[in-house]
Amino acid sequence: LPLDRLSDVDRYALARYGEVASRVLRAYDRYEFQTVVHTLNNYLTVDLSAFYVDISKDRLYTFGPGSDARRSAQTVIHTIADGLTRLVAPILPFTADEPWRNLPSADADSVHLADFPTGVDTLVDPELIDRWTRVLSLPGAVNGEMHKLSTEQVTGSAPAAAVPLPPHP
């Protein structure tokens, strides 16, 4: 699907990928391999595994093959899988070859003959990233307040609590 037909959360996932890929490419240019590894590891565990893949599963498993919601997630997952495979190839050469052989978009016989992703800076959308960062911070803030209220015995249980949300800017 084209970018303008992707869901908001899918555009956020793509924007975060663009941000991470840009940082990784700069680190490679500077031979800062520790930054490459740290950035990719954090992105894979926090952004992808703990968030995006988790919330995309329902759309991928239950929506019809032609639905925009499913195709939106598939488009983003494919773009990220292609780009990440290229980005990890220098540090995980054998590991990167396996997904590369299974990507329908693989444009070379080996990931090691393929170019790094280009144009990733254009995927970055600071306003979208900022908005989703605020949204994703809410559960932690709410849980922190709930814990504080329960230890102060202001409320006995979560259903009895009310948490005021900050106004939308």
Regions of interest found by a model, annotated:
Residues L1-L25, V53-E145, L149-E152, A158-P167:
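Acidic, turn-prone loop/beta-hairpin segments
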